[in-house]
Regions:
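Residues that define the transmembrane beta-barrel architecture of outer-membrane proteins
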Residues: 22-26, 33, 64-66, 124-128, ...
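N-terminal periplasmic accessory domains that precede
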Residues: 1-16, 28
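Well-ordered beta-strand positions enriched in small/hydrophobic/aromatic, beta-favoring residues
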Residues: 5, 17-19, 41, 146
Length: 215
């Protein structure tokens, strides 16, 4: 399976940076150059707590996402360069449900559905990626490189949630609940884990011929 993406990472010529923050998270970027060495590093933090609080379910939501990426280069000889690309991503999700209430039906036949819940869910997803490349420029039109990369992923999902259902007629104007139509209970449990490790070593070559590039 091939990709049409051709990503080129920038090399800063001096010190640069930026940062921003909001109710949904924050991000920062810094780049620098000191002759033979350059680096660009970015950091992002996101949270969806305020967005998820608008759902029908009364619960404690605490999802957060952290992403760190860096790209470093070092030219140790006129035609030789070594670079490193690294990425770390950590996603956490915590959910403690309390109640859920939904009304549906028509004006003359309105129903109310309630769920009283207990328990919690905790999920965690971590990925770590690193790639080291040794690059040699034979001339202006020819480039050779040796790459080694590693990827590891860790996914954990666990929850123990119980719910008591109640279905009844919605309250009439000026009155109380009329009738309980149905009562039920459910339990959900899960312990899912997935760990994976992938390593790769490869060699590449690039030849530029007028308006064409051969890889």
């Amino acid at each position: 399976m091939s990709s049409v993406l051709d990503i080129t990472y920038k090399k800063p010529k001096g010190f640069e940076g930026s940062a921003s923050a909001s109710l949904l998270g924050a991000n920062a970027y810094v780049g620098s150059s000191s002759g033979k060495f350059t680096q660009v590093t970015g950091f992002r933090y996101k949270t969806g707590r305020s967005l998820l609080k608008t759902t029908d379910t009364d619960a404690e939501y605490d999802p957060n996402f952290i992403d760190l990426q860096t790209y470093m280069t070092y030219q140790f000889a006129p035609k030789w360069e070594i670079n490193f690309l690294g990425n770390l991503a950590i996603n956490n999700y915590k959910f403690i449900p309390h109640t859920r209430e939904t009304s549906f039906g028509t004006a003359t036949n309105a129903k109310k559905f309630k769920v009283f819940m207990s328990g919690q869910e905790r999920d965690k997803f971590e990925t770590l990626f690193g790639a080291l490349t040794l690059k040699h420029n034979l001339n202006e039109n020819t480039e050779l490189g040796l790459q080694a990369s590693a990827f590891t992923s860790k996914e954990e999902e666990g929850y123990d949630i119980a719910g008591d259902y109640w279905l009844g007629d919605a309250a009439e104007e000026g009155g109380g609940e009329i009738e309980n139509l149905s009562i039920a209970r459910y339990n959900e449990h899960a312990r899912n884990r997935l760990h994976s490790n992938i390593m790769n070593v490869g060699h590449y070559g690039i030849a530029r011929m007028k308006n064409n590039t051969l890889k």
